[in-house]
Every structure is written in C-alpha cells, then in structure tokens.
Amino acid sequence: MRLHHLHVAYLDHKASSSSSSPAPPSISPSSIPGSAAFPAFSFKCLRPLAPKISLPEPRKMIAPPDFVVPRARNASKLLNYTVQVPAAGTTRWNPSAEQIKVLEMLYRGGMRTPNSVQIERITEELGKYGRIEGKNVFYWFQNHKARERQKQKRAALLTLSTLDPSLLPATANETKEAPEKKEKDVEDGLASCKRRCKAWGDGAGDGDAVVATEAAGGCTDEVTLELFPLHPQGKA
C-alpha cells in the first residue's frame, strides 16, 4: 500500500510539472527489472561520479644546448687530429748539409766512437741546423767507419791486381829451385851423418862397416851410442 501511494504521488507530481514546462523523459521503476525491491526515492539519490584524475603530461627529454656544443667541438678537434697524423716514413733522419759538414770534420779530427757525453754535446750543437737525435749521431759514426773499412779493402785488392808483371817470373824461378835446394840439404845431412859415425868408430874397418850401414839406411834412423861401450861396436 505504501508503495502504491508513493507511485500515485509521483504521477501527480509529474502531471503538474508537465503542465508547467516540458520535462525530460524519465525512467519508470516498472521498466527496470527488479525495481520492486527498491523504493522510488532510490532513483533520485544518484551516487556522484568519481572525480577525474589528471595525469601529468610526459616530459620530453631534451638535452640542453650546453651539452651538445662541446661534443661538436670535440668531434671537430678529433677530425683535425686525424688529418694531421704524419705519414709513414717521415720519422727518418734527413741530415742537412751543415750537419754532415760538422760530422765529417769531427771524423777527420780523429773521433771514431764518441761516448754518451760527446754524443749529447754533438746532438745539441747539430740541433741548431735541423732535427736530430743522439742515436742518429751514433749510427752515423758506425756507418762511416764501416764504409772506410770497405774502401781500404777495395784499395788493397786494386793494388794487388796492378802489381808489376816482371815480378811473376822471379817467383816461378824460386818455385823451381826449391826442390833442388831440398835435395842438396838432404845430401849435406847425409854427409854430416857419415862424419859423425866415423868419429864414433873404434877402428878403420869398423868405421867403414858403420859408414856402409848408415849409408845403406840413408841415415834415416838415429842410433844412440853408449858413452863408454864395453865392447867395440860390431863385436860380441
């Protein structure tokens, strides 16, 4: 009954409001399924909507110009350094005329192997005429000595090749006379051996026998005689 009275009051209120001004269409409780379980005033007390949460806008990560400019400058510097790299082979020592003149003057003065102190002084002095290092001075003296030795060897060979040809026959004659001289020396040695055997002989006959024996043997074997023989040689 109470629900019926509320429904009638709602219709009367609707009729009075529709006569004064047009009202927007409303939803009747009967059109909603299960509306009998809820009172009519529950449709008027609507729950307010939740407030809209506004999210912050995503920030755009933009690098400041202070960080960009130095990178560009560094890149340009690296490019310049890359371009300015010296080409291969430029580290080789190219002596100037003044440097060679001073080094040759020192070499003619008697300097052959300078020590570390001398090399340092020479390098400091030659640095006025161009780029030079201590190792360049050291190797220059070593190479100069090697070239001088080669020149001396070539000069000696050239001197031997240009000797007087008249000296060659004399050398050949000396070569031919060498065997004859050797034979003469052998004969002289044999004669001295015979004389030595005669001096040690006890008698004339024994001496002849000893001489004959020595002559037959060619005096090739030396015989050691006793200083005081008990028996004469050749006799028992």
Swiss-Prot record:
Residues 88-152 bind DNA. Keywords: Developmental protein, DNA-binding, Homeobox, Nucleus, Transcription, Transcription regulation. Residues 174-187 have a biased composition (Basic and acidic residues). Residues 169-188 are annotated as: Disordered. It is found in: Nucleus. Pfam families: Homeodomain. It comes from the Eukaryota. GO terms for cellular component: nucleus. The keyword Nucleus applies. One of its GO terms (molecular function) is DNA-binding transcription factor activity. GO terms for biological process: cell division; phloem or xylem histogenesis; procambium histogenesis; signal transduction; tissue development. Transcription factor which may be involved in developmental processes. Belongs to the WUS homeobox family. This is WUSCHEL-related homeobox 4.
